[in-house]
Regions:
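Catalytic-core regions of glycoside hydrolase
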Residues: 1-2, 8, 39-43, 112-120, ...
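N-terminal substrate-binding region of glycoside hydrolase catalytic domains
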Residues: 1-86
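Short, flexible loop/turn elements at secondary-structure junctions
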Residues: 14-18, 23, 49-53, 106, ...
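An active-site-proximal structural segment forming one wall of the substrate-binding cleft
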Residues: 34-45, 68-112, 136-150
Length: 193
């Protein structure tokens, strides 16, 4: 911490599969244990839970697919069909439980909307060329709406990459929609395209 003067928030990104390994099984310790280290040092934490990672077979728990959620195989990993009703139902239930635990917690600076696209950053530019599926604005809105439904006190943020790879962020329909819902923007850099 001493190497980063002014550091106020530590950001944790984890796959959904790590946090909910079974339908009725929650492993909150994977968030809480590292978070406590920073909270005890007077810092806050922020979370992004992802559905797709390219460093593991499935960011989405396998039980979601066994329940009937559709997916695509992409270079050795699975990408969920983000507008699949089963996927959305399981995500809705997960977010309800996550919000019950973290919404309004003063140690949580923000929650990053993360269940869409690679690394939860909203882009599918790496996967669409493989399987040919493109998700539109309505799918992105559904994901945003699920988060807004459950997180009413803690600030929600969204990656500017939801606008699309190399797309202008200013007045992008999905960014405008997110902002209209009280969601703020986040970027891995200094908000540059």
């Amino acid at each position: 911490l001493d190497d980063f003067p002014g550091l106020s928030t530590v950001y944790l990104r984890l796959p959904w599969a790590f946090v909910q390994p079974g339908e009725d099984e929650y492993n909150w310790e994977v968030l809480d244990t590292p978070a406590q280290r920073w909270i005890q040092a007077g810092k806050r934490v922020a979370f992004r839970i992802t559905a797709t990672e390219n460093w593991m077979q499935s960011g989405t728990p396998e039980w979601v697919f066994r329940s009937g959620a559709k997916f695509y195989e992409v270079n050795g990993y699975k990408e969920p069909e983000y507008d699949d009703p089963v996927f959305l139902q399981k995500l809705d239930a997960f977010l309800e439980r996550m919000a019950r635990r973290y919404d309004g917690n003063p140690n949580v600076a923000f929650i990053d909307i993360g269940h869409f696209g690679m690394w939860g950053e909203g882009h599918t530019v790496l996967t669409t060329p493989v399987h040919g599926k493109k998700w539109g604005l309505e799918t992105q809105k559904r994901i945003i709406d699920l988060y807004c439904k459950h997180f009413r006190r803690t600030q929600l943020v969204i990656s500017d990459d939801f606008a699309g790879h190399d797309a202008p962020v200013v007045h992008s329909p999905i960014i405008d929609y997110a902002l209209s819902k009280g969601v703020s923007l986040r970027d891995d850099s200094i908000l540059v395209q």
